[in-house]
Amino acid sequence: MEYLSHADKYAEELRKSCLLMHKLADSPAGQVQTLRSLMGAGLGSAILKEGNPIALHYVMFIPALMGQGTVEQQAKWLEKAYNLNIIGTYAQNTNDNGYLGFDKVRIPREQLLMKHSQVLENGTYVKPTNSKLSYATMVFVRVVVCQDVTLNLRKAVTIATRYSCVRRQSELKPGDREPQVMDYQAQQHKLLPPLAATFGFQLAADHLWNLYNTANNSMEQGDMELLPDLHGLSCALKALCSSEAANFVETCRQSCGGHGYMSCSNFPRIYGQVTAAITYEGENTVLWLQVARYLVKTRKEKSGGLSVKYLIDEEKGPRTVDTTPEGILRLYRRVAVGLVDIAIAELENNSRKGYAPHDAWNHAAVHLIKAAQAHARLFVVESFVDSLKESRLSSPVRSILSQLCELFIIYWILDRSGDFFLCANLKKEDLLLLNSKYVHLLAAIRPQAVNIVDSFDLRDEILGSPLGCWDGNVYQRLFDEAAKSPLNQKNVHESFHKYLKPLLKSNL
């Protein structure tokens, strides 16, 4: 695939995706689970490396019919969509965004999704009972985005961790054998926080998925109470997971040295897929500001959903610093509250200066975005800490998850220490203690790093990288990949005789 033309890549992926759909139709057992795997960053990425041309149909088009179509519309269109008699698409040709314009065209009413809003026969538009009802499909897709970027991050961390345990370099002790790169604390600092993040993001995405299902069931009964909170959380988590995963994937790539920049390492493709998620289904800056609006409203009105309860119920008792996971969770809450209050103060200050409301908002955007990001990080940390209370966890699993959780939540504090100094009463000695804990956790998790990434159960075909191969035979596989290049099919490429050789003999 790497050496096909752009047009040939598209045709080949379309051929394979259509063949897969035929195979799937012949094997109904486990069809739903297989379909989900084919549309995401797992099995689908192994077979369809350049993307699945009909993934959009299953991920967005069918959910939109289910969530926004009337009973009659679903009866007419859903079966056709499931059987691929109709296919939903953006009509993209991957060169640019297409568009469709109408001039005095009357769209049949039955082809307007009218579960929540309607157009009457006389042309009157009837608004939905809640303006955010039409967001249901986007909320669903944002949950899928969180899961997808997390899986891509798992792939990147697996590749980088395995390679770092194969690659040996320099001398840790003079005269000793070159150690595995993973034995250097600096490499652990690069790779173990992303490893821990895969668990935090997945647990938060699972939590959000459960909330989505609960809210969806409530909405079917006409209860919209959970919708604002769900919308705010889905915006926050999508923005956080995509942006953090992009940064972590790039760190993983850099941790593999020059080999990480090779096309066959699969890092360029993984990075491209994750960074794209920063923009689609809501550009992250726009989403952060939507979240901020919800937070400001909640703080001012003292009313909101479960995820923002901390903005309504003030912390009681002395604001001491406790470095246990539960204590650190309280620090995150203080920061989230503090940054919302700072943003509100900035808005009020702008209003006193005479700014119109929209200008006051624009001039407070930096503070508002920071508040929204703190809210998102709090949700991830809460999901991670709460998961450790699960009684079903075995003692060894609970132990390693606890270490990963503690590493991750301390990593974020050290990375954003200014916010914790400003809002959480953190002092220099607290930060030094957390830093000491952090490096201790790096050393404690290091011996289990390969076992942890192996537990992801990602086959070599899904990783698609010689650097992350399960058997560790990295360099032979790199040689084999290089041999596939059309440039390496001849000992001396004809361009040498045509261009370089005359230059060498020209006596410039």
Region spans (language model):
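Flavin-dependent oxidoreductase catalytic core characteristic
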Residues: 1-508
